[in-house]
Amino acid sequence: MSGRFVRASKYRHIFGQTCKKELCYDNIKLSNNAWDSNLLSVNPFYLSVNWNAGAGGALAVIPLNERGKLPDQVNLFRGHTAAVLDTDWNPFHDQVLASGGDDSKIMIWKVPEDYTVMEPYEDVHPIAELKGHSRKVGLVQYHPTAANVLASSSADNTIKLWDCEKGVAHVSLKMDVMCQSMSFNADGTRLVTTSRDKKVRVWDPRTDKPVSVGNGHAGAKNPRVVWLGSLDRFATTGFSKMSDRQIALWDPTNLSEPIGGFTTLDTGSGILMPFWDDGTKVIYLAGKGDGNIRYYEYENDVFHYLSEFKSVDPQRGIAFLPKRGVNVSENEVMRAYKSVNDSIIEPISFIVPRRSESFQSDIYPPAPSGKPSLTAEEWASGKDAQPDLLDMSTLYESKGTVEKAVSATVPSAGAQVQKHNEEKVETPKPEAQPVSKPKESAEEQKPSKEPEVKPTTPSASKVEEPSKKRDEDNHQKEETVTQPKREKTPVEKSFPKPASSPVTFSEDVKKEPSEEKKLEVSDEAPKAAPLAESKKVEEKEPFYVSKDKKDISAVNLADLNKRFEGFEKRYEEELAIRDWKIAQLEDKLAKLTEAIKEKCN
């Protein structure tokens, strides 16, 4: 009997599932910088995007639950004076983010509480700045077990290990050329790098000399590297001399050659970005410039091909969600966020189809919990520890509710940084003082105190125009006018501001209080934003007013969120039905296969 044997694997049927367009993130302005990075970074709550901000550098942070089309102008995280090249979320604090830029600076950011991109908000400034590199910082990556320890790679041919809380670099690893990719192992005791000299180096992060060095891919394009989590192995992707795309598996104790040699995959031209799932022992390879994502299962020092997610939409940036953020109830083992045409970010769920609706413990081993095992001082003193792990069944019992990781302290590195931030915040204060006078006078003229405006009909709204100076005797006239159409007059909308920021939207119009005042709306009139008469306001129309001048209120946003939740619920129900049908078809196919084999025998 001759037959074909299929390797048994519980991940053999993993498939990638996209979502509908209305559940994607639209109106994205992805950075067009030529530096080779992933451009995106994600944690269970936020998605960071290297933004095309024109002059200077900026990044955008999008809450994952705010899907749909973003406003034309969004709130940005500004502080870099050149393009942002790479970002990484703190694994122990879901609101803290690090970024490296073309200006040789490293910025630490904190996402404000109740942050949103759907409503106007002041640009966010860094809470700390790490200075030490002399050229652009192309890579930043947090330590997997020690809180507030950050690795950064620069074009000055150094890799620095920072204590973000103190703002000092404990170690500086010197290289002959620039590092192009780096990755920690699971406990952070080893760091592997690839570089322009086509060498692969394994480092002890506390020493300034590599533990071992070997020859990597021979091609001219940038190689990538990823450590295989808790395993004593790492993988690289790159190109051969003939520009064939390759993958290689390495033993960090012997870099003379890769295990099994360099494996050729195809002749594609895009760089392969590797992502490792330590729970399933599956590696995902996303090609930059093409729309496909391949995945292989690691077993006995061999990568076994599983399947491929195919798409006609090429990706230039991509990020994978940490394990504690996946949807356990839907048997989702990984989730990717890929850019589409540099204007849309599309979530892709990788699902293991199962018939049972109970928790699938065999595909969800414990995963990193988001709690540090060491402090930065303990790590610097030489201590090591395994990562703190989370029982994934708790996510199933909580119906996918993930708690924010806030174990790490928020860094406030260096007195220079604090002074720098204070100057940015305090300078607008003297300018804002004359603006407060019209507010006080407007409060004195509220209709509740001096009702001078009466509507002619219950449905019509009228407003009272404050008096103006028209001659030297300060002669005043009061007029009652009907509220003009919104097509002619822009609407100014007031939103709550963070208490720490003294800057207000009213600073855009700086005139004497006697020359310009705002109109008041009577109690009987429907709620609307105050009208402004200044020509400057007409020229700089607020970005939250749409072309047809429709009011966007919190109530409307709540309705939209409810509709999105309804769409998601319906999508999940249809997905479950589809998976059930697939499982039935697989059973029928298996039975038919067995019947055919019996007949052949």
UniProtKB/Swiss-Prot annotation:
The lineage of its organism: Eukaryota, Fungi, Dikarya, Ascomycota, Taphrinomycotina. The keyword Ribonucleoprotein does not apply. Residues 419-429, 437-453, 462-495, 507-526 have a biased composition (Basic and acidic residues). Binds to F-actin. Residues 361-386, 407-540 are annotated as: Disordered. The gene is crn1. Residues 556-600 form a coiled coil. Keywords: Actin-binding, Coiled coil, Phosphoprotein, Repeat, WD repeat. GO terms for cellular component: actin cortical patch; cell tip; endocytic vesicle; mating projection actin fusion focus; mitotic actomyosin contractile ring. The keyword Iron-sulfur does not apply. This is Coronin-like protein crn1. GO terms for molecular function: actin filament binding. WD repeats lie at residues 79-119, 132-172, 174-213, 220-260, 266-306. One of its GO terms (biological process) is actin filament bundle assembly. The modification Phosphoserine is found at residues 500-501, 553. It comes from the Eukaryota. Belongs to the WD repeat coronin family. Pfam families: DUF1899, WD40, WD40_4. PANTHER family: CORONIN. InterPro entries: Coronin (IPR015505), DUF1899 (IPR015048), G-protein_beta_WD-40_rep (IPR020472), WD40/YVTN_repeat-like_dom_sf (IPR015943), WD40_repeat_dom_sf (IPR036322), WD40_rpt (IPR001680).
